[in-house]
From Swiss-Prot:
Molecular-function GO term, any one: aspartate ammonia-lyase activity
Binding, L-aspartate: 99, 138-140, 185, 317, 322
Pfam families the record matches: FumaraseC_C, Lyase_1
GO cellular component: cytosol
Gene behind this protein: aspA
Chain spans, region SS loop: 315-324
Active site: 316 (proton acceptor)
Name of the protein in question: Aspartate ammonia-lyase
EC number: 4.3.1.1
């Protein structure tokens, strides 16, 4: 055991661990979610990149010596490589605007650096968590900058599963291009379309959301490093701000820049609201698609039954043979959670006061949660559902030609009123629109056959109005 102290007192720390007294206090104070920092490696890596960039800038400015720079950078590289992540034990939701997370990072890096230099853990006179690792920084610029770097990476990582889903929908659109079916508005028969057109809209929806995700990265490119406490830059070197921008670009390989006004950037959480809004947009639209898939596959005998979803597992403990649309159902629920997380982000952003928003920990927690579950849900929907969807072509075809909705195709030829009369009689007699129109000799068989050709009902079509 080793003894560490702070201005509150002292505590015994196990010699096996790399965190220190402030981390231990935080772990005892905040047992809220049981989701610890170690559950989010992207945040640990981005925070380590911030600390490495700071060490490089501080060394160049002569604020720390070369030996310390090398040791701190070595420790940061270990964290970026995924090592020692079990040492990050603070709860994701915490009081103090993220200070506990920042100090967990400072203490682990300091003790890793001490070992690298041949010292014992806790010998902070050689490498101090605050004086050396946290030099030229405050939690108030280090935490949000690390968070934005992590969000940038999560946005980038979300693109691949979204592209896979888009491509799966596009492939189904090609497969189903010849399958004519009934389009519906307000759950009532409308006009014909193809199943391919339906799936093409899903592919386009995802493609547009991919554009939104890529654009959202620009909202988190602007950091507030060098602002320290409230953005004024107290306790930082006059050249630190320009230098840290170059160093963070070198360390991350990403086009991050420092905000023009660090005071505004330190208190602003607008970028998080925008990113969360994009995730909510994806969730809302994805949930609607899952609603469609569940409805289109309903049945098999007493529903629409236009498509078949892959059978994943038995659906009932009491009804033999029942299979449920479990994949769209789970994605629906993920989308509900993402939408709820967005509300939490909005409330936390609104809750800021004066020069700092202390609620960034819950913003970080909710955003990371949304990224994780939404990414997994998209992959699950792609591989366990969309790729295996098949069409019930005869059912789709019969719905069209037994539908009252195709009477709309007669409108340009015989007018609305006569078309409505035919629809009314077809409903009353349980006969087809085609048979009623033919029987009344309103149009010839050749004319009706031409009007009701699928290709003439699926897109704009030139016509001549037939005389009464």
């Amino acid at each position: 055991m080793r003894i560490e102290h702070d201005f509150i007192g002292q505590m015994e720390i196990s010699d096996e661990v790399y965190y220190g007294i402030q981390t231990l206090r935080a772990s005892e104070n905040f047992f809220i979610t049981n989701d610890k920092l170690c559950s989010y490696p992207v945040f640990i890596k981005s925070f380590a990149q911030v600390k490495k960039a700071a060490a490089l800038a501080n060394a160049q400015l002569g604020l720390i010596d070369e030996k310390l720079k090398i040791a701190i950078c070595h420790a940061c590289d270990l964290l970026v490589d995924g090592k020692y992540h079990d040492q990050f034990i603070v709860d994701m939701i915490q009081g103090g605007a993220g200070t506990s997370t920042n100090m967990n990072m400072n203490e682990v890096i300091a003790n890793l650096a001490l070992e690298y230099m041949g010292h014992q853990k806790g010998e902070y006179q050689f490498c101090h968590p605050n004086d050396h690792v946290n030099r030229s920084q405050s939690t108030n610029d280090a935490y949000p900058s690390a968070l934005k770097i992590a969000i940038y990476e999560r946005l980038s990582n979300l693109v691949a599963p979204m592209k896979a889903l888009r491509d799966a929908f596009a492939q189904k659109a090609k497969e189903f291009a010849h399958v004519i079916k009934m389009g519906r508005t307000q759950l009532q028969d409308a006009v014909p379309m193809t199943l391919g057109q339906e799936f093409e809209t899903y592919a386009l929806m995802v493609d547009r959301d991919i554009e939104q995700v890529l654009d959202a990265r620009n909202w988190v490119r602007e950091l507030n490093l060098g602002g320290t406490v409230i953005g004024t830059g107290i306790n930082s070197h006059p050249d630190y701000r320009s230098l840290i921008e170059k160093k963070i670009q070198e360390v991350t390989g990403r086009p991050f820049v420092m905000a023009n006004n660090l005071i505004e950037a330190t208190q602003s959480t607008g970028a998080y609201v925008q990113v969360s809004g994009v995730l909510k947009r994806i969730a809302v639209k994805l949930s609607k698609v899952c609603n469609d898939l569940r409805l289109l596959s309903s049945g098999p005998r007493a529903g629409l039954n236009e498509i078949n979803l892959p059978k994943m597992q038995p659906g009932s403990s009491i009804m033999p043979g029942k299979v449920n649309p479990v994949i769209p159902e789970v994605v629906n629920q993920v989308c509900f959670a993402v939408i709820g997380n967005d509300l939490s982000v909005a409330l936390a952003a609104e809750g800021g006061q004066l020069q700092l928003n202390v609620f960034e920990p819950v913003i970080a927690y909710k955003l990371f949660h949304s990224f994780v579950i939404l990414g997994r849900a998209i992959e699950t929907l792609t591989t366990k559902c969309v790729e295996g969807i098949t069409a019930n072509e005869k059912i789709c075809h019969d719905y069209v030609f037994n539908s009252i909705g195709i009477v709309t195709a007669l409108n340009p030829h015989i007018g609305y009123e006569k078309s409505a009369m035919i629809a009314k009689e077809a409903l009353k007699s349980d006969r087809s629109i085609y048979d009623i129109a033919l029987e009344k000799k309103i149009l010839t068989k050749e004319q009706l056959d031409d009007i009701f050709k699928p290709e003439n009902m699926l897109s704009p079509h030139a016509f001549k109005k037939h005389k009464d």
